Amino acid sequence: MVNSCCGSVCSHQGCGRDLCQETCCRPSCCETTCCRTTYCRPSCCVSSCCRPQCCQSVCCQPTCCRPRCCISSCCRPSCCVSSCCKPQCCQSMCCQPTCCRPRCCISSCCRPSCCVSSCCRPQCCQSVCCQPTCCHPSCSISSCCRPSCCESSCCRPCCCLRPVCGRVSCHTTCYRPTCVISSCPRPLCCASSCC
């Protein structure tokens, strides 16, 4: 029987296709002949068996998300962990708050769901990602200065460089003492906290 061959004897003799059963998926049996798309089962998703050909929906789980399994066919939300957060995994299906790490913050991954403190990079400061939850000092650049980003941590002089008040950076929600500079002292900016 197959079950009786799934021990040390099986690992020494070699793992053939007939031995690649769910009960026989051991680290010692995860060779090229056993780790195939037809035999990639959840019980085979171990560190030694995490091969590119095993990165299917049934095997792409948090316990199987290793760097060598992070390929385009394995980029799924369940694989969005720190060890699998690669640039090629930053797609719409993998760009979630649990996957927003600094090394995943590329231009193709700048989405509202990725706007967290660790992903707030200049290349993510677009209209779709510039939200109050993403307004951090590291995002205080000219391309990210928008009314929704005017918080205490984002209201810096570099955000108050628009010539016309009431537009973009010089908005009523952004009038704070740190924003009062020579290029932005308009009557509209004279709020109680900004006078």
UniProtKB/Swiss-Prot annotation:
Q: Looking at the record's lineage, which domain of life comes first? A: Eukaryota
Cellular component per GO, a single term: cytosol
UniProt cross-references to InterPro entries, sorted A to Z: KAP (IPR002494)
**Does the record carry Transcription regulation as a key word?**
no
| Pfam families per the UniProt record, alphabetical | Keratin_B2_2
Write the record's keywords in alphabetical order, separated by commas. Answer: Keratin, Repeat
- Outline the segment boundaries, as ranges, of region: 27 X 5 AA repeats of C-C-[GIKRQVHEL]-[SPTR]-[STVQRMC]: 5-163
Which family does this protein fall into?
Belongs to the KRTAP type 4 family.
Its biological purpose is as follows: In the hair cortex, hair keratin intermediate filaments are embedded in an interfilamentous matrix, consisting of hair keratin-associated proteins (KRTAP), which are essential for the formation of a rigid and resistant hair shaft through their extensive disulfide bond cross-linking with abundant cysteine residues of hair keratins. The matrix proteins include the high-sulfur and high-glycine-tyrosine keratins.
Q: Assembly state and interactors?
A: Interacts with hair keratins.
Q: Mind telling me what this protein is named?
A: Keratin-associated protein 4-11
Q: Which organism is it from?
A: Homo sapiens (Human)
- Gene name in the database record: KRTAP4-11
